[in-house]
């Protein structure tokens, strides 16, 4: 796989099943998929940035950045949390995770986000 052939785009509600499939295959269990489902349903985490990586029409990676806040900060800086990052096993260790992180950071920077924490 060549990273230049990978399309990274914002995930939509139509991509829900593909996102869940990537999460389950990447982690080998439902835990991360349930986390993603819960975060996508959490209105306090909006606006979130959910990106899907596709190769030859197949969803192969997903990353989620959720809005967060820092208690005690007034005013609170614009903060997001990166969790989770998932890549199907057969596409791991080829730079796809880094590609998703870079694209997510680019979008967050355009949004004026000041900090990103990784869980």
Q: PLM features: residue spans?
A:
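Short amphipathic alpha-helix that is part of the acyltransferase structural core
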Residues: 1-38, 44-60, 81
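Glycine-rich, small/polar surface segments that engage phosphate groups of diverse ligands
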Residues: 61-63, 68-69
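A conserved beta-turn-beta hairpin within the catalytic core of GNAT-like acetyltransferases
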Residues: 69-82, 92
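Short coil/turn connectors at secondary-structure junctions
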Residues: 77, 96, 113-114
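Conserved acetyl-CoA-binding loop-helix of GNAT-fold acetyltransferases
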Residues: 82, 87, 93-106
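Conserved GNAT acetyl-CoA-binding A-motif
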Residues: 101, 106-119
